[in-house]
Amino acid sequence: MLVMSHVLAAVAWPYANGPRHIGHVSGFGVPSDVFARYMRMAGHDVLMVSGTDEHGTPIQVQADAEGVTPRELADRYNRVIVADLHGLGLTYDLFTRTTTGNHYAVVQELFEGMYRNGYIVSKTTMGAISPSTGRTLPDRYIEGTCPICGYESARGDQCDSCGNQLDPIDLRNPKSKINGETPKFVETEHFFLDLPALAGVLGQWLDTREGWRPNVLRFSKNLLDDLQPRAITRDLEWGVPIPLDGWRERGDKRIYVWFDAVIGYLSASIEWARRSGDPQAWRRWWSADGPGKDAPSHYFMGKDNIVFHSVIWPALLAGYSGEGSHDGQPGELGRLNLPTEVVSSEFLTMEGRKFSSSRRVVIYVRDFLERYDADALRYFIAVAGPESNDTDFTWAEFLRRNNDELVAGWGNLVNRSISMAAKNFGAIPPVDPAGLTEADETLLAVARAGFDTVGELIGRHRQKQAIGEAMKVVAEANRYLSEQAPWKLKGEADRPRMGTVLHVALQVVSDANTLLTPFLPHSAQKIHQLLGGTGVHAPMPVIEEVEDLDGGPAYPVLTGDYTVGARWESVPLAVGRALDPPKPVFRKLDPSIVDEELARLAG
């Protein structure tokens, strides 16, 4: 593996208009945590950041409907989402929000820097209003036929079928999603990102991307064929104010949510540094001319957000850094790194249907965690999630994976290995002085080889293959125990051999536990302790209530100390370390849960 001192894990920002369901976390949450945990275990200095995305039309419209302010709505769901992600054990160095003073300042700095460099321009365009109310009609609440692919339910800002960004006036047969009326289009002044002026630098950058998933790279390059200037402000009262003379005080114009949300990766890194006591520490992951010039950055999101991470965000970074056809000078933050890798997952469906809160085709993370263990969901996402193809979550398949693989495979190996050693020796047994057999050596070698194989696959974002390789070690160890049958070695003369077999089995349990720690951290900590280990093996995040650094109201963040924990290596077990009879690590689920959960879906 390449030696990397600093690694940025930038995770898509969940929108703060409701609790998260398992489809959300399958695409960005769990995969990013697996990657970050592995990288830390391998010795890298990881900064994993994200937060709740709290601006934009949907929140304002929902708040109006509920009779609350947008801030009150965002506050509510920020806390819910923080609790959801904490329950899954996602190890954010900082999970914050976009309504902080720090975020506003960073967004406005990038806006001003790009404006000075000529990559943000003002122009008059056509905006939609409701004929019946006279109010601005948000583009997200206009629906019609996509002019590019013909999809009949395209939104006014983006087509979910072909992924292209749109303007409401581009749609054929546009209708308001609020009341079904045809919008009226009137002139309005807005600021635009001059994407064509950045097409050259984007193309050169994309040509240097190696190891990207083919669909992501192909889609991104296709977007460059017809880049158009994109509006980055909206007729809206809720959002980041425009930081230019004559615009700051206006209450009817705000920076578009997609512009401010992607800047969150940078603002969260800066906030983390400020909170850590070293305000310039963020530069170790971001500064293209300084300490972060060789720092790789990995961005995690669902496929519907590829355009924002492979075109829009790189364009903002390049424009602010003074690159592109207009040239210019970097702003006060300096030249900033463009993404190293954009890791896009496909979609997770549920029982053959698209997730939908309104149609009750959903299971929220908080509800799942009330009934099942976090590692059961993390395991399903790792082995059967939407890494490279759309995947269907069914309760029958979840039950099978949990009972047949997690419980009967991994859980069985842990339980019987430790049980036999505790019963017959009360501790980690010694190896027979006569030495190891070929079977012993072979199994130990298989486990040791897993550190290279599994680690390399996680590093390349091939997590399905990675956990598959780790579970092969588990299967080999179960086969070894069945063939060696230590329970049959009952005589005094056989006791040294029994001890050797159980020592080898326990060593492989320890190694396999380390290999599975990025995927199954909750159970990994338990298994570490069952093996007589002490201290933190798999660190967990904590929720902290913090004050806004720039004078705003307090809010909860996810953070943690992840400098402790297991290393990515085989650690020899200490002979004589006491062992107690183990309790089952994983819960076997009753088949009746399938019908129970399907009944819940049916309402």
Curated annotation (Swiss-Prot):
Motif 'KMSKS' region, residue numbers: 354-358
Binding residue positions for ATP: S357
GO molecular function terms noted in the UniProt entry: ATP binding; metal ion binding; methionine-tRNA ligase activity
CDD domains: Anticodon_Ia_Met, MetRS_core
EC number: 6.1.1.10
Binding of Zn(2+), residues: C146, C149, C159, C162
Enzyme class (EC, first level): ligase
UniProt GO BP: methionyl-tRNA aminoacylation
Family matches, as NCBIfam families: metG
Protein name: Methionine--tRNA ligase
Native species: Salinispora tropica (strain ATCC BAA-916 / DSM 44818 / JCM 13857 / NBRC 105044 / CNB-440)
Lineage of producing organism: Bacteria, Bacillati, Actinomycetota, Actinomycetes, Micromonosporales
Encoding gene (name): metG
